[in-house]
UniProtKB/Swiss-Prot annotation:
One of its GO terms (biological process) is cortical actin cytoskeleton organization. It comes from Saccharomyces cerevisiae (strain ATCC 204508 / S288c). The modification Phosphothreonine is found at T222, T659. Its main location: membrane. This is Phosphatidylinositol 4-phosphate 5-kinase MSS4.
Length: 779
């Protein structure tokens, strides 16, 4: 009596699953039904009753051949189920056990699938009673029995090989090393694909005795919930070939005699998959393996599937042809729409990219490298003054950020209010942690907040410009004050260290300064944005002269994106007000731009070229500013003038931002709008942050002036009075700088008034000229 070993519930013998990987309820396995009906009355003997048969089964198990697909073998080599030393198994039907080649041929429809053989449904089967069923097949089968397994639909049924019987009439179905996975079995002699569901090598640690299998009835009842969803991988499914238009037409006409050939396979191979021509089947055998009807493993983008429909009824072929025709039409229309939309999208992206490149090209060239410093020395980590600069920026960031409530009308107390912040390594509720320990003091925060709003500054932009990167550029003061200048990253703002006396003078007159700025939006006085103090730890007492450092944040009068060709600092005095030029360096070094003074201005016959309208506006505003400074008991201030020559810039072939479009800009611009309200456009900052020169007919010329009153924090103190008395003993009081504030204001205004003329001035040898041989006095 033949013995057929049962399989575990997840084992599918490949010999019986070459047709399809799963079966629908409408197509029950007739072959399985025949086997079960014929052997229902067969008893299941004990494994001990036939030791020879068990011995042969164990022997065959040692020599079994696995039908693991190449793709799945590669993917499971790293799986913990594979023990060390195991390798992948053959992937084609031709590599099966040689005994299979002598098996009988069974004709059947390609749509018929064979389920696993019946097993005891009891999962708690004892190890002493392995699940076995007997095989009913003798070596010679009658014609009646053969008719049960043949299904003559169509012209010719495909033939597949079935496992052969051994000498004891036992069917060799021991494939315990195979379990279900989502994969394929590919025959190298044909282009047919076997869907083997889940195929991989079982772990050797799992005993075949403890494995159980489900009955055919259970298999049929649970097949809908066990439908595999096989993902598509190009490396595993490289030979899945779609149907072309000719195949669709044949299906529509009811022609089911399509035969695969190498030419069709090569021409239909997907471009994204590797192309491997498959060998032709033997002409003698003419045995073709059928392709499964399952389409769950194909990619969702493919609308056509390569199918062999021998043995398929005409109704099914007609339905498939109709679906394929509709799909082809829809795919063609969708592909055309996708092509047009893709072209439009690519064109839009190209235009956007070109626009971004153009905007980047128009940006300021000095900001290309964020770490580059154009003016002065770079103050970054490692610099001797980096700790001071770091503390300044950290204090400004915290103080300005906290001063962001609702703006209220200022009171007299706001002009005397100060706010202290203590920074340490750990931080607290008021201040964040800092890299260094220091104390920060903010003077009149609400007043300077109002001033920043009057000057049209946005708080966020203000903080970003100063504290976006803790990198500043340091510039020593060209004057005698000894102050340090730190430029922000975008060169819009300047941090200037001041003396304690200057800090006291500003705090004393901050209310007058605020009222003047509010009433005179076109004022020439320098714009102050904040007054602060940094107190360093006592450990810095030996490194710096003073532990307390007072500093101001003010505007940079000159634009960072334009070259200032010549600069003048005019006070109205002539004693020591001359700058010796290094002509050789001036010719070689284009960055050498010394600040010229009053005597240089007079020798060169320079004039501020303003027409009648601009001259009147300029002198009117200058008079108001000078009156305020005289009222505040201030002296030693000066008018800083920077001149940008448009023609010279073109001749030098300088790449200046928007310089070529200056002539096309209107003479006046509308008011600018900030978060706090409308701010009137500054009259003297209309063109690139400056004012355009004009002739006697009020026509613009190719010069841009940047003018402003600076250094107006010097109080006429007792020391200045003593200096005035000392200088008057040897020089005329009209020539020296240290004179009373009222006299200083009048002389200053008269000198500037004489310098404003649209016509060039003639060179004169006046009493302003100092003796060149005399030692210059640094004013």
């Amino acid at each position: 009596m033949s013995v057929l070993r049962s399989q575990p519930p997840s084992v599918v013998p490949l010999h019986l699953t070459t047709s399809t990987s799963r079966k629908t309820e409408q197509e029950p396995s007739l072959l399985h039904s025949a086997i079960i009906e014929r052997h229902q009355d067969r008893s299941v003997p004990n494994s001990n009753s036939n030791p020879d048969s068990n011995h042969r089964i164990k022997k065959d198990r040692n020599n079994h051949t696995s039908y693991h697909s190449s793709s799945n073998s590669e993917s499971n080599m790293e799986s913990p189920r594979l023990s060390d030393g195991e390798s992948s198994t053959p992937t084609s039907i031709e590599e099966l056990n040689p005994t299979i080649n002598n098996s009988r041929l069974v004709k059947r429809n390609y749509s018929i699938s064979i389920d696993p053989l019946h097993d005891n449904s009891n999962n708690n089967t004892d190890d002493d009673h392995p699940n076995t069923i007997t095989s009913p097949r003798p070596n010679s089968t009658s014609n009646k029995e053969m008719q049960k397994y043949s299904f003559p639909e169509g012209k010719e049924s495909k033939k597949i090989t079935t496992p052969s019987l051994n000498s004891n009439n036992c069917l060799d179905l021991d494939n315990s090393s195979l379990v279900h996975t989502d994969s394929y079995i590919q025959d190298l002699n044909d282009d047919h694909i076997l869907l083997n569901k889940r195929v991989s090598r079982r772990s050797s640690r799992i005993s075949a005795v403890t494995a159980t299998s489900t009955t055919i009835k259970q298999r049929r009842n649970t097949q809908d919930s066990n439908l595999p969803n096989i993902p598509f991988h190009a490396s595993k499914h490289s030979q899945i070939l779609p149907m072309d238009d000719s195949d669709v037409i044949k299906l529509a006409n009811g022609d089911t005699s399509m035969k695969p050939n190498s030419a069709t396979k090569i021409s239909h191979s997907m471009t994204s998959l590797p192309l491997h021509p498959l060998p032709q089947p033997s002409q003698k055998s003419k045995q073709y393996h059928m392709i499964s009807k399952s389409t769950t493993s194909l990619p969702p983008e493919n609308d056509h599937y390569y199918q062999h429909s021998r043995g398929t009824n005409h109704n099914h072929a007609a339905n498939a042809a109709a679906v394929n025709n509709n799909t082809t039409t829809t795919t063609a229309a969708t592909g055309l729409k996708r092509s047009e939309s893709a072209t439009a999208e690519i064109k839009k992206m190209r235009q956007s990219l070109l626009h971004k490149r153009e905007m980047k090209r128009k940006r300021k060239t000095f900001l290309v490298d964020d770490d580059r410093v154009l003016i002065g020395n770079k103050v970054s980590e490692g610099h001797v003054n980096f700790i001071i600069a770091y503390n300044m920026l950290t204090g400004i960031r915290v103080a300005v950020s906290r001063c962001s409530g609702i703006m209220k009308p200022l009171t007299p107390a706001d002009f005397r209010f100060t706010k202290k912040l203590a920074f340490d390594y750990h931080g607290n509720e008021l201040t964040p942690s800092s890299q260094y320990a220091f104390k920060f003091k903010d003077y009149c925060p609400e007043v300077f907040r109002e001033l920043r709003a009057l000057f049209g500054l946005d708080p966020a932009d203000y903080l970003v410009s100063l504290t976006s990167k803790y990198i500043l550029s340091e510039l020593n003061s060209p004057g005698k004050s000894g102050s340090f200048f730190y430029y922000s990253r975008d060169y819009k703002y300047i941090i200037k260290t001041i003396h304690h006396s200057e800090h006291i003078h500003l705090r004393k007159h901050i209310q007058e300064y605020y009222n003047h700025v509010r009433d005179n939006p076109n004022t020439l006085i320098c714009q102050f944005y904040g007054l602060h103090r940094v107190k360093m730890p006592i450990s810095f007492q030996n490194k710096i002269k003073h532990r307390k450092i007072y500093f101001l944040v003010m505007n940079n009068l000159f634009p960072p994106h334009l070259d200032i060709h010549i600069t003048y600092d005019l006070k109205g005095s002539t004693w020591g007000r001359f700058t010796n030029l290094d002509k050789e360096r001036l010719a070689k070094d284009r960055s050498y731009r010394p600040v010229m003074k009053d005597l240089n201005w007079l020798e060169e016959g320079q004039k501020i070229k303003f027409g009648p309208l601009k001259k009147k506006t300029f002198l009117t505003q200058l008079k108001k500013d000078v009156e305020l400074l005289a009222k505040l008991n201030t002296m030693d201030y000066s008018l800083l003038i920077g001149i940008h020559d448009i023609n010279k810039a073109k001749e030098d072939d300088l790449q200046l931002a928007d310089t070529a479009s200056i002539e096309e800009q209107p003479q006046t611009q509308g008011p600018i709008r900030t978060g706090t309200g409308t701010v009137v456009r500054h009259f003297f900052r209309e063109f690139e942050g400056g004012i355009r020169a004009s002739d006697q007919f009020n026509n613009d010329v190719d010069l841009i002036y940047y003018v402003g009153i600076i250094d107006f924090l010097t109080n006429y103190s007792v020391m200045k009075k003593l200096e005035t008395f000392w200088r008057s003993l040897r020089h005329d009081t009209k020539l020296v700088s240290a004179i009373p504030p009222r006299d200083y204001a009048n002389r200053f205004y008269e000198f500037i008034e004489d310098s404003v003329d649209p016509l060039p001035q003639k060179k004169t040898q006046s009493s302003y000229r100092d003796d060149p041989n005399q030692k210059n006095y640094k004013d």
